[in-house]
Structure formats: C-alpha cells, structure tokens
Amino acid sequence: MKTNEILHDEFLSVVETQLKSNNPPETKQTYERLISLGISDKDAKIYIAQCVASEIFHTIKHKRPYDEQRYIRNLNNLPDFPAE
C-alpha cells in the first residue's frame, strides 16, 4: 500500500507536538526507550505515529472518544505494531 504523505506528515506532527509538550509523558518515555534499543530518531517517531494513527482510526471506526489508556498500552508495546 502506498503511503499517504499528507497523513504521514500530520501523524508525525502530532508526535512532535507530544514530544515537545511532554503530553502525554508516555510518548517521550516511549521515544527514549526506542532510541535506547538502537532505533533511529526517524524510525522511533514513525513507530509512535503508528500508535497515533491506530488510535485515530479506532476512534472514527467505533465512533468512540479518544482512549488515552489504549494509546499508552500501544506505546508500551512498541516496537511491536499496535495491537488494539
């Protein structure tokens, strides 16, 4: 599947905002953990962006509010792909 560059950039923008604002703090903790595993800066942010995308998709598909706890569980499971 071809990457939608606009969505890709927007998801990465969300990650950058979360890292700068430290909100939620688990985003920065996850980023630092991924870096410590030898994952590059770019790839660590892409992994986190996958969690952002998964949460947005889940919210739209199920017509439910954003679930920060699910998002954090997915962050904690990285570098494995989001499970929920």
Regions found by a protein language model. Give the residues of each.
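Structure-specific DNA junction-binding interface
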Residues: M1-E84
